[in-house]
Design a protein with these regions (language model features):
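Interaction-surface and assembly-scaffold signal
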Residues: 1-7, 101-230
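Aromatic- and glycine-enriched beta-alpha-beta binding-site module
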Residues: 57-137
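N-terminal domain-onset segments
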Residues: 1-66, 193, 201-205, 215, ...
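Intrinsically disordered, low-complexity regions enriched in small/polar residues
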Residues: 14, 19, 23, 58-59, ...
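Generic preference for flexible, low-structure residues
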Residues: 42, 51, 61, 68, ...
Length: 230
């Protein structure tokens, strides 16, 4: 650990984080009107295609396994195109704090999770306040479809002053997740449901057209990232 950060102060480990992962994702086109305002400057929206996913990480760093779920937009900054988490949910306090403070993820806690399948059918969901915000059911067909380039991840890491309404820290973070192995990569068709919620308006980005779905397993490292002052 950097000795500028006293030992035992942070409630999470510093990068690199490492895990085996499982991801169930559906890709779709959404209305641009509700999507555009959710992409903060200086990031720029590249298309109206989003990824909506439920993920499970059998993690070695941190040591506790966890779930994530997200709506990820296709954005660009400084000639770099990647994925920005419009909405994000996770299952542990440690990941909630660590991903926000290190890389700038936008996270809330999810209350109820599932992700599984049998090689032909897969399903996954996240619920919060008794509402299934994302519920995906996929049937494996092998049908190919066009996917946007959503790696690297692009985040706006913003922390406000405690004394007034201005940013104490504001940077674009380019995080190049290192996928070292992909052991399962299945494509198919999906059904997606998104429960309306005033507190969690994920359903405002329900796709008007589904493009396809995939289920992936592999191994990944979340490294230190590049920070750009804005």
């Amino acid at each position: 650990m950097d000795k500028l950060i006293p030992d035992n102060v942070l409630p999470y480990p510093l990068p690199p984080w490492e895990h085996d992962y499982r991801v169930l994702a559906v890709f779709g086109e959404v209305e641009e009107a509700p999507l555009q305002p959710l992409v903060p400057p200086p990031l720029k929206l590249c298309s109206s295609t989003v990824q909506i996913s439920v993920m499970y990480f059998d993690s070695s760093v941190p040591t506790e396994p966890y779930y994530d779920a997200a709506v990820i937009a296709d954005v660009e900054y400084g000639g770099i195109r990647g994925g920005f988490w419009i909405h994000g949910y996770t299952s542990t306090d440690l990941v909630h704090a660590g991903t926000r403070e290190i890389w700038g993820y936008r996270m809330k806690r999810g209350d109820d999770w599932s992700l599984g399948g049998d090689g032909e059918h897969y399903s996954g969901h996240v619920a919060r306040r008794n509402k299934r915000l994302i519920d995906i059911k996929m049937t494996v067909t092998g049908k190919e479809f066009k996917q946007p380039k959503l790696f690297p991840r692009l985040f706006l890491k913003l922390i406000p002053h405690a004394s007034h309404a201005q940013a104490a820290l504001k940077k674009v973070v380019v995080m190049r997740a290192e996928t070292t192995a992909v052991t399962v990569d299945l494509k198919g068709e999906a059904r997606l449901s998104m429960a309306p919620s005033l507190q969690d308006p994920v359903a405002d980005l329900a796709p008007v057209k589904l493009l396809g779905a995939n289920y992936i397993e592999g191994h990944q490292v979340l490294p230190w990232a590049e920070e750009v002052d804005v």
